[in-house]
């Protein structure tokens, strides 16, 4: 017996795939989140991007999320994702997309540069947390929730914003943003924002 495919479901899958491709999703993510065939996804990708999808495996190491800058970006994305999920505004891949759009709004990339946290990596992060490989831990200094390895001791964790590595401080001194160089300017900007 042949199962008949729903035209409406196929249209929804095509729309979802187009949105994911526009945000930079890799083929493996498209295959996982839609019911479209690999051939149709490749054809759609080529039509939208003008080139075939990149080849290669998905990132599978949790270590990428632990380096200081990647951790800050990943934590920002995941907190937005968690808020959307808990508030019941959306779920599943829709929550990933909305949280990723919020992340891009808050962390705009320089012209010609890709965002530090790619959509596929953000999607992988959600899967790592769901599978118990990563978790959110509260910083004992600022109270912010940050991505850490699972089973991290709950007390004593200090985030990389409160305790940046020395290379972050060196990079900050080279920044063209005055608020990055002169801490008092940053404090004033924070007070005005509050």
Swiss-Prot record:
Its main location: cytoplasm. Binds 1 zinc ion per subunit. GO terms for cellular component: cytoplasm. Belongs to the FlhC family. Functions in complex with FlhD as a master transcriptional regulator that regulates transcription of several flagellar and non-flagellar operons by binding to their promoter region. Activates expression of class 2 flagellar genes, including fliA, which is a flagellum-specific sigma factor that turns on the class 3 genes. Also regulates genes whose products function in a variety of physiological pathways. Zn(2+) binds at residues 139, 142, 159, 162. Its cofactor is Zn(2+). Heterohexamer composed of two FlhC and four FlhD subunits. Each FlhC binds a FlhD dimer, forming a heterotrimer, and a hexamer assembles by dimerization of two heterotrimers. This is Flagellar transcriptional regulator FlhC. It is found in: Cytoplasm. GO terms for molecular function: DNA binding; zinc ion binding. InterPro entries: FlhC (IPR007944). Keywords: Activator, Bacterial flagellum biogenesis, Cytoplasm, DNA-binding, Metal-binding, Transcription, Transcription regulation, Zinc. It comes from the Bacteria. The keyword Metal-binding applies. GO terms for biological process: bacterial-type flagellum organization; positive regulation of DNA-templated transcription; regulation of bacterial-type flagellum assembly.
